[in-house]
Amino acid sequence: MDVIKKKHWWQSDALKWSVLGLLGLLVGYLVVLMYAQGEYLFAITTLILSSAGLYIFANRKAYAWRYVYPGMAGMGLFVLFPLVCTIAIAFTNYSSTNQLTFERAQEVLLDRSWQAGKTYNFGLYPAGDEWQLALSDGETGKNYLSDAFKFGREQKLQLKETTAQPEGERANLRVITQNRQALSDITAILPDGNKVMMSSLRQFSGTQPLYTLDGDGTLTNNQSGVKYRPNNQIGFYQSITADGNWGDEKLSPGYTVTTGWKNFTRVFTDEGIQKPFLAIFVWTVVFSLITVFLTVAVGMVLACLVQWEALRGKAVYRVLLILPYAVPSFISILIFKGLFNQSFGEINMMLSALFGVKPAWFSDPTTARTMLIIVNTWLGYPYMMILCMGLLKAIPDDLYEASAMDGAGPFQNFFKITLPLLIKPLTPLMIASFAFNFNNFVLIQLLTNGGPDRLGTTTPAGYTDLLVNYTYRIAFEGGGGQDFGLAAAIATLIFLLVGALAIVNLKATRMKFD
């Protein structure tokens, strides 16, 4: 007789499909919202990941994919999606002055107004639970008063000329400030039909829209008569001359447009960007290579020393040498920043007492770079030492015994046996270390902040900047505005450079050991 296994209520198919249906509706709603807001890339990504997840968890045939999907979704969301966004921004003029869409920038400009008529002093007087608005003309001495009204909506108030003062005490500045938004929504209509609106905390004045949108998409300045046309090459409304050519004036805010390869060509054609970019690229490669070499060399030598059988207190030495790895790197970096202080740092005090010198660690490019390499070696050698300590255990003692019988010394053992046997398994880790130091943002940012600065550059750049720090400074610290498009272009180039260097290193390693 077949045994029918009883299902719990939470295992029922009805509940499963209900939950999946609700999730599908929620995802659909979010995708529509993103699409309506113009966030097309976010909408597409959410739709793809959510649809794939719902299909995998709803279909029994895709059961095996349930174990793979979370990792793939995470990689797509946190690796591929930011990469695609960065590359997409690199082909636009997206910056602090060009963040809005064309429609939103046009709306902001059309909302601007200018004072085009008389100015009237105003007062606000209580009328029970309501208020009365009183205006006075300083030139003619005429007074105008509205009927009682309540705050809370856009409204038009018809004012009448009066000679009597309103009853009650005039509202003070605090009350006016608290109701400033409501007062800004009021349009006061004078007996002659002129309309005035609040222009300051004490005045109403005749205001008109500063710009008028013409049928051909041109904006006309109602105050000066200048016409502006959208220039989709630069993403601004730009003035046009009488003969139809572009003028010099641009209206802010601008809007985001596609610029093609402009940001990439700027990197190689604009001397103010090209020179610091190439110099920073060379320094980044040199910094990464020297750091990898020194950390591996120091770590390997120390690992051999603490594994030496004749050494007493090896456990204590191991703990002391691994301590830099246990301390968070940002704490160590800030401590070194104090130690290297040019005026009060302990390192300069010691060098001054012993040799009579006080290096300018933060103002001289050479000593600043030397300081970075010293600090980075201190931070990186414990990791390499731990790896080498583990790898040394895998080297058979027979090799050293045989070399001892041949009369080999410690140096011959190290260069003929230890180094060749350690360098092969360390190679992939050295490549990973190179890639990490190529983008070692935290060290530069906390220790030198890229300084000392380079002179005569279009973008902010320093002698100790790595490419990633240079990109950050362009995006967030530019004196002429934050240029996200150019920063994204440089970030894309960094991605290609790191990827190419990693591929070359891997192929070179494979050729060497094959």
UniProtKB/Swiss-Prot annotation:
One of its GO terms (cellular component) is maltose transport complex. Residues 37-39, 93-283, 342-369, 436-483 are periplasmic. The chain crosses the membrane at residues 17-36, 40-57, 70-92, 284-306, 319-341, 370-392, 413-435, 484-506. It is a multi-pass membrane protein. Residues 1-16, 58-69, 307-318, 393-412, 507-514 are cytoplasmic. It comes from the Bacteria. Keywords: Cell inner membrane, Cell membrane, Membrane, Sugar transport, Transmembrane, Transmembrane helix, Transport. InterPro entries: MalF_N, MalF_N_TM, MalF_P2, MalF_P2_sf, MetI-like, MetI-like_sf. The keyword Acetylation does not apply. GO terms for molecular function: ABC-type maltose transporter activity. PROSITE patterns: ABC_TM1 (PS50928). SUPFAM superfamilies: MalF N-terminal region-like, MetI-like. Residues 281-505 form the ABC transmembrane type-1 domain. It is found in: Cell inner membrane. The complex is composed of two ATP-binding proteins (MalK), two transmembrane proteins (MalG and MalF) and a solute-binding protein (MalE). Part of the ABC transporter complex MalEFGK involved in maltose/maltodextrin import. Probably responsible for the translocation of the substrate across the membrane. Belongs to the binding-protein-dependent transport system permease family. MalFG subfamily. This is Maltose/maltodextrin transport system permease protein MalF. The gene is malF.
